Structures are given as C-alpha cells and as structure tokens.
Design a protein with these regions (language model features):
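Glycine/serine-rich phosphate-binding loop and adjoining beta1-alpha1 elements at the start
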Residues: 2, 8, 77-169, 298-300
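Glycine-rich phosphate/diphosphate-binding loop of Rossmann-like nucleotide-binding domains
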Residues: 6-45, 152-240, 287
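Adenosine-phosphate binding glycine-rich loop
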Residues: 118-159, 269, 274-364
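Short glycine-/small-residue-rich Rossmann-like dinucleotide-binding loops
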Residues: 69, 75-76, 95-96, 221, ...
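An N-terminal-biased, well-structured beta-alpha scaffold segment characteristic
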Residues: 2-106, 110
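Rossmann-like adenosine-cofactor binding region
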Residues: 209-291
Length: 364
C-alpha cells in the first residue's frame, strides 16, 4: 500500500503521525511510505531519518495526498485540506466529527473512508488510540491551568500547591476517566486540594482507593458541582462520550459561582466542550475571558509537547497502521471488530451512530 504522512498544519500542531521507526516497519513489509518535507522536524525527526528508514520525501502536502492510498495524520484535515481528500482514499486520524459539521460534510462529499482514532475500541471497550493523548492532555491541563492562575496571566494569583502556613489551591476535575485521572494525579502531585467528580460509583470507588490522600471523590450532579464552584480555583473539564458531543456540565449562569480570575480548562473541547461558554482556542491565543473567568480551550493540547506525545501516540497507532496496510481497510475491519468501530464515514455515508445523531440532517 502507498501510505502518505502530511505535515500537520493546524495551529501549533507539532506532532507527526509516523516516526522513522514506524516507516521502517512498513517499508520492511513491502509498503511505500511518502512523508512531506519537514513533517517530523518539530517532533525531533529530520527528513534524513525517514530516508534512512526507507521512506521517500515529497515537497508539498498536495503531493502527499495526491499519491497516497492511505493518509495517516494526527489531527483532522482543516479546510485547506478538504479538496485534497479524494474518493476511495483512507484517512486515519483523530476526527472528532460530532463537534464539526463543516468537516463532516466535507468528508461525506469527498467519498473517502474516514477511520477515527478516537472511536477504535479494545475488547474491553477502552479506547486504545485515545488513551495516550488523554494521559498527556490530562497532565498538561493542570500545568496550563496553574500557569493561567498566575496574576500576570489574568488569573486570581493562586499557587496550586500553597506553601507552609497557606492553604493550597483547589482543583475540581469533572470526569474520572483517563483525562480526569491524570489531571487529578498531576494536581495532587503539586500539592493542590483536589476533588474529582464522576457519575460511576465503581469508578469513584476505584479512584478513592488509589488516589493520593489530597484527592477526594464526589458523585457528579448539577447540585454538587454548584456547591463546589465557590471555593474552586481551577476546573478541569474531562468528560467523554465516545464519538459524541460532550454534555455541558457548567452553564453560563453557573460562572457567577466562581470567584473572578478562576480558570476553566476544557479538555473536552474537541468534542464540543463541556462548558456552555467554551469555544475552541489555539496555542497561539489559548485563553479568553467571560464574566471574569478565564477559559482555556485549546483543542490540541498535546501538540505543545510533540517529543513526548508523538512517541506516545505512534506507539499505539502503528499496529493498526500496519494492519490496515497489510490487509486493506475492509479486510482489517472485518477481522477486528474494535478497529471497525473506528469507521465514522465510508464513501459518503455516516456509519458511526453518535455522529449520525449529531447531524441528523446530513445526507450523502
């Protein structure tokens, strides 16, 4: 199979979808790998490393899309890439369709096969291609939130860990999955007073048993969230419904319960966001203020640490890339029901239920 690796062009997206080591594995199996010039440079991989692995370098993104049977990316195609995706081409990347009608419509019109990292499942229903980036995003959410709590950044001027004789800052984590777990661990490690809220009692029980002593658990409801907000400095939104839009757990009206200068970090923004007042931001302009509350809503948080996140991502994706290249998408999906769940749009038709539910009016 001919595999194309374009350079990511989303704002400050520094990851790359395939390392030279991954390219070497594919070439060894008889596949042809084309990599766009400097695609890996921000992750620490020069063109020469890909060439040494047996890949070929192409000068432009148009060249890569034009020749490849399978495009492997990190983030969804942006508007300038829509015309490059063609009928019958397999595109394997994070799509997050449910929060982006324009992208969904463009991929329907392209006639391509869209296989989404975020809905591929393991037999136990965990999400193997979402987990590594959720780990990174969860940890970074606290790192970034702590930074914007600083007064020069517009925050209230709180040090999350406190100091002897001064209370630590308070962090509320909404969602106890992979993102929430990692966010709570990071916040706890800084010495913050952490509360993690979730709807699953078994999950809360597990977290209560395994988390550090400065992490408390809370059954999530509008009432319990409202009770927590007046004393909270940093809120991490970490809810996930696979493939679907995130629910709004904090409304505009609830912002008045927070003290001015508090920070909301919405890790669920790539699925539409879990705060009513959220809209996507970029690493170049990461925050905005509504009702004196800072909102950090960067949709590609791990893109800021590519030398960590590229390796974490490609460790997980490479076995699937090899399977798709070796068997073709139809045979590979037939043999692996978990991979088949990654199919979101196939040749003009929405095939993933949560995406179809998000856009009932879209027709092929």
């Amino acid at each position: 199979m001919i595999i194309g690796i374009p350079k990511e062009i989303k704002n400050n997206e520094n990851r790359v979808a395939l390392t030279p080591a991954g390219a070497k594995e594919l070439v060894k199996r008889g596949h042809t790998v084309y990599v766009q010039h400097t695609a890996g440079i921000n992750s620490g991989f020069a063109d020469d490393a890909y060439v040494a692995a047996g890949a070929r370098i192409l000068p432009s993104i148009e060249d890569v899309y034009g020749i490849a049977e399978m495009i492997v990316k990190v983030k969804e195609p942006i508007a300038s890439e829509y015309p490059l995706v063609r009928k019958g081409q397999l595109v394997f990347t994070y799509f997050h369709f449910a929060s982006d009608e324009a992208l969904t419509l463009a991929m329907i019109k392209s006639g391509s096969i869209c296989l989404a990292y975020e809905t591929v499942e393991n037999p136990d229903h965990t999400l193997p291609l979402l987990i590594p980036m959720s780990e990174v995003a969860g940890r970074m959410s606290v790192q970034e939130g702590a930074r914007f709590l600083e007064k020069p950044q517009g925050g209230k001027g709180v040090l999350l860990g406190g100091v002897p004789g001064v209370k630590p800052g308070k962090v509320l984590v909404l969602g106890g999955g992979v993102v929430g777990h990692n966010a709570a661990l990071m916040a706890a490690g800084l010495g913050a007073d952490v509360t993690i809220a979730d709807l699953s009692l078994p999950r809360l029980r597990y977290l209560s048993e395994t988390m550090p002593k400065n992490v408390k658990t809370l059954f999530s409801s509008t009432h319990t969230i409202e009770q927590e907000l007046p004393t909270t400095d940093l809120v991490i939104g970490a809810v996930l419904i696979p493939g679907a839009k995130a629910p709004h757990l904090i409304t505009r009206d609830m912002l008045k319960l927070l003290k001015p200068g508090s920070v909301l970090v919405d890790v669920a923004i790539d699925q539409g966001g879990c705060f009513e007042t959220s809209h996507p931001t970029t690493h170049a302009n990461p925050v905005y203020e509504i009702d004196d509350i800072l909102h950090y809503c960067v949709a590609n948080i791990p893109g800021a640490v590519p030398q960590t996140s590229t390796l974490a991502l490609t460790n997980a994706t490479l076995p699937y890339v090899i399977k798709l290249a070796d068997r073709g998408w139809e045979k590979a999906c037939e043999e692996d029901p978990g991979l088949e769940l990654g199919l979101n749009i196939v040749e003009g038709k929405i095939v993933y239920p949560a995406v179809a539910e998000a856009f009932p009016s879209l027709k092929a």
